[in-house]
């Protein structure tokens, strides 16, 4: 087990206390929390240009009339804040600069932070966390070779194309742009994972071969692959790390409900809108025009009013389409990040043997990396826009002891159990970071089985949990549930009122 000095815990604790995801951020930037009148909200870069609002998505900009927006709140977009935060601490000491770098890592800026980490290490070569982090960056910079993937590619049962990143090989059925976006996100996740554990003093292996992943265009092909691998237990999942192939498989959520049905409805609305446009264009100036779109009631307009009404409807359809696109990215890219953590845990030997970590810990840790905001990876241990509502809806959550003993896990995907796993790891990692690292260390230590009075896996984990966090589980459970009642996403914190 590592001592506090080896982990550099004082520096890390300074960073953690400053950066726990409370949602507070520098406000001196454009609006990034956007609340819409009819439905939905989004966290993404937005600028107001006269009567228009321009929203930035990963694949381009979307323009909307300002009147669809109920409220705008500036801030909460780390890429916009990074340069100013870095300038503010440029002349400060190593600890403060490291805290800012740690903020960047936990907010997904794992590419942007590299030069700052190297500067910190140059200023103080004895600063242990930054020394380990620059060392792992050097090792990550070494070229990777391709894995042997011919057999896996054939086993997929469909034609796929090959795309590569420095550490990722993706077999896909998508456009080059979509494949590149997915790979870029996964590369950020890989950097974040290795920087996180390097800072904490865990010496892990870095990829020597590109990590293999497959992305089906259609859910039915994903399900067919699972059946061919006798993995039907995972048929309710959107992605799966296959340990025998050492590869991730996932499918495009646009091929399945609710995305598929919602997109079909929007497409039908657009077709209706176009037909009404053509009708209005041909109508005499003084005519009265009846318009009915979708489930809306029939309304009668003059020609000028009809033109204005159709423009409003087009604006609403554009807004709905954008929100649907953001929902798709949140789930699909979040799944890709989640499964990448399982793959990295295996590749890096964080989990030396598959049964060393309980399922709740493996899934809860992977969920710390799956938050997507504005279509971009949001970083590590963020207040989870998808898991947090699931956790709040739990009617009968597992008692902490049963959860630690892995009760209910190991039978495929269970949304409620995974929400609890995310919430527990989120709490332990952010509120008890040193004990959490001790727990990880104990589980990775081969001698634990010999030291423990009982050897079955559930008891071994429970014993390690007690050593790390203490034996008063009732007190810890009360603290956990109390903490989770305070957790809010940035969008939740500012939802009330209007601007």
Regions found by a protein language model. Give the residues of each.
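Bacterial N-terminal signal peptides
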Residues: 10-21
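Compositionally biased alpha-helical segments
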Residues: 21-161, 169, 176, 184-188, ...
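Sec-exported extracytoplasmic/periplasmic mature domains
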Residues: 102-110, 118-126, 135-139, 191-202, ...
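Acidic/His/Gly-enriched intrinsically disordered linker/tail segments
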Residues: 72-77, 154-156, 232-248, 310, ...
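Bacterial N-terminal signal peptides that target proteins for export
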Residues: 2-12
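Solvent-exposed coil/turn segments that connect beta secondary-structure elements
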Residues: 39, 47-50, 58-60, 67-74, ...
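Juxtacatalytic substrate-recognition/specificity segment
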Residues: 159-353, 358, 448, 460-461
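Extracytoplasmic/secreted envelope proteins and their assembly/folding machinery
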Residues: 52, 98-101, 114-117, 183-190, ...
């Amino acid at each position: 087990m590592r001592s506090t000095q080896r982990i550099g815990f004082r520096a890390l604790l300074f960073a953690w206390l400053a950066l726990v995801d409370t949602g507070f951020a520098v406000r001196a930037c454009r609006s990034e929390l956007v609340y819409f009148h009819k439905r939905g909200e989004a966290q993404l870069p937005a600028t107001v240009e006269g009567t228009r609002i321009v929203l930035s998505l990963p694949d381009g900009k979307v323009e909307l009339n300002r009147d669809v927006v109920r409220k705008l709140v500036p801030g909460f977009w780390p890429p916009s804040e990074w340069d100013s935060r870095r300038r503010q601490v440029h002349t400060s000491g190593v600890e403060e600069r490291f805290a800012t770098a740690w903020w960047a890592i936990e907010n997904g800026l794992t590419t942007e932070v590299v030069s700052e980490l190297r500067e910190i290490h140059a200023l103080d070569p004895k600063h242990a966390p930054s020394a380990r982090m620059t060392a792992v960056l050097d090792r990550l910079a070494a070229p990777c070779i391709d894995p042997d993937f011919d057999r896996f590619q054939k086993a997929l049962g469909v034609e796929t194309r090959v795309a590569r990143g420095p550490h990722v090989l993706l077999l896909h059925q998508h456009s080059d742009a979509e494949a590149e976006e997915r790979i870029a996100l996964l590369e950020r996740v890989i950097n974040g994972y290795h920087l996180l554990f390097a800072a904490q003093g865990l010496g892990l292996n870095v990829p020597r071969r590109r990590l293999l992943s497959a992305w089906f265009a259609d859910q039915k092909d994903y399900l067919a692959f699972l059946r061919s691998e006798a993995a039907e237990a995972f048929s309710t999942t959107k992605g799966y790390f296959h340990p025998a192939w050492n590869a991730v498989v996932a499918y495009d959520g646009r091929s399945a409900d609710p995305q598929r049905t919602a997109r079909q409805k929007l497409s039908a609305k657009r077709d209706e809108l176009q037909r009404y446009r053509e009708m209005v264009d041909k109508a005499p100036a003084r005519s009265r025009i009846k318009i009915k779109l979708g489930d809306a009631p029939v309304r009668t307009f003059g020609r000028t009013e009809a033109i204005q009404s159709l423009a409003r409807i087009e604006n609403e359809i554009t807004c709905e389409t954008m929100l649907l696109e953001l929902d798709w990215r949140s789930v699909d890219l979040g799944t890709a990040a989640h499964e990448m953590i399982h793959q990295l845990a295996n590749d890096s030997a964080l989990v030396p043997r598959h049964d060393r970590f309980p399922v709740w810990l493996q899934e809860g840790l992977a969920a710390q990396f799956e938050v997507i905001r504005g279509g971009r990876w949001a970083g590590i241990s963020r207040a989870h826009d998808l898991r947090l509502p699931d956790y709040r809806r739990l009617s009968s959550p597992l008692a902490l002891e049963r959860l630690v003993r892995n009760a209910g896990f190991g039978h495929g995907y269970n949304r409620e159990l995974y929400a609890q796993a995310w919430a527990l790891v989120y709490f332990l990692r952010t509120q008890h970071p040193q004990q959490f690292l001790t727990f990880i260390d104990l589980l990775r230590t081969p001698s634990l089985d010999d030291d423990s009075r009982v050897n079955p896996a559930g008891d071994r984990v429970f014993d390690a949990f007690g050593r790390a966090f203490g034996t008063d589980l009732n007190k810890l459970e009360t603290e956990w549930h109390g903490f989770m009642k305070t957790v809010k996403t940035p969008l939740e914190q500012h939802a009330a009122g209007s601007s």
